[in-house]
Amino acid sequence: MQRLQICVYIYLFVLIVAGPVDLSENSEQKENVEKEGLCNACTWRQNTKSSRIEAIKIQILSKLRLETAPNISRDAVRQLLPRAPPLRELIDQYDVQRDDSSDGSLEDDDYHATTETVIAMPAETDLLMQVEGKPKCCFFKFSSKIQYNKVVKAQLWIYLRPVKTPTTVFVQILRLIKPMKDGTRYTGIRSLKLDMNPGTGIWQSIDVKTVLQNWLKQPESNLGIKIKALDENGHDLAVTFPGPGEDGLNPFLEVKVTDTPKRSRRDFGLDCDEHSTESRCRRYPLTVDFEAFGWDWIIAPKRYKANYCSGECEFVFLQKYPHTHLVHQANPRGSAGPCCTPTKMSPINMLYFNGKEQIIYGKIPAMVVDRCGCS
């Protein structure tokens, strides 16, 4: 009997001593599991962020129909950018990304970017344009962005050098044609007279929409144009071939085009901020820096807020389609789990150089994640 009591005391002593140790170990193990879970979540989120950046680079090139990023250096951009009013307005009043998250709508737009403005710089002169032993300005080539869209406006911009005294300037735009029997090589497009005062040079725009439309219908008739801006003394003030200190003063075409309006559809989803403690599917902030890529061919924006989706998806949590949960309940082993994906995206406007060194202003669809959900 005494021996039995001793055994009981020993057993109770072991329980008393071992109990706290066991609880302490369980607590420590739980804490380690939680820390490991947080580390795994951070790693997963970082991988998702990196994948999102790479996907954005691929999407931009694909949506702009570019096989590779245009090889245009920062110095080349400075030389090619016209110092002209229309471009300055685009840059100064640039709307980096539209804030329309409040209406819950999502444009049912095409995959590719839609063009709004094209700034075409003079291209290399064709042999047919060799007149009097030297090339004449200017010859413009047009990409499919102009050819397959409706032209709303077309302006030829020319820069007139400053004058020392008040003078009247006669501006004439001529279109090069195939030589006629009488030797005629040019036919008039537009002419105007304007008064200039001493001071800085000025930009002058001329409407060439009709001419451009004819060129698009009959590409073989596009042999180029000649620009003259003579003052009262017969001096040509038009900058056609920029000299020293005249970078960015080339003539150029500003063409505005329009696309078919797109329909809209309604879409709603969870939108969480970066400070949320929610561990499940949500949106996280992500800023894409084009300069960090070395993409100097993008004029604006230099960076934009793209955002990305990350987090866990349970079968009953914010599923995009109600039948997803029912399918899983019917066959839990045979159905894949829902994924955390964007449920609402919006476009960004972009000003960039294409492969032909033309400046394009357009809209790229589905580049900003506004909301995330499980589907």
UniProtKB/Swiss-Prot annotation:
Pfam family of the protein (one): TGFb_propeptide
Signal peptide: 1-18
Record bears the keyword Disulfide bond: yes
Positions bearing carbohydrate: N71
Propeptide residue interval(s): 19-266
Disulfide bond listed as a keyword: yes
Residues the record marks as site: Cleavage: R98, D99
GO molecular function annotation: cytokine activity; growth factor activity; heparin binding; identical protein binding
Entries under CDD domains matching the protein: TGF_beta_GDF8
Keyword tags: Cleavage on pair of basic residues, Cytokine, Disulfide bond, Glycoprotein, Growth factor, Heparin-binding, Secreted, Signal
Disulfide feature: C281-C340, C309-C372, C313-C374
Coiled-coil segments on the chain, per record: none
Localisation per UniProt entry: Secreted
GO CC field: extracellular space
Modification after translation: Synthesized as large precursor molecule that undergoes proteolytic cleavage to generate an N-terminal propeptide and a disulfide linked C-terminal dimer, which is the biologically active molecule. The circulating form consists of a latent complex of the C-terminal dimer and other proteins, including its propeptide, which maintain the C-terminal dimer in a latent, inactive state. Ligand activation requires additional cleavage of the prodomain by a tolloid-like metalloproteinase.
Family listed: Belongs to the TGF-beta family.
Function: Acts specifically as a negative regulator of skeletal muscle growth.
Oligomeric and partner information: Homodimer; disulfide-linked. Interacts with WFIKKN2, leading to inhibit its activity. Interacts with FSTL3.
Stated name of the protein: Growth/differentiation factor 8
Source species of the chain: Vulpes lagopus
Gene name as annotated: MSTN
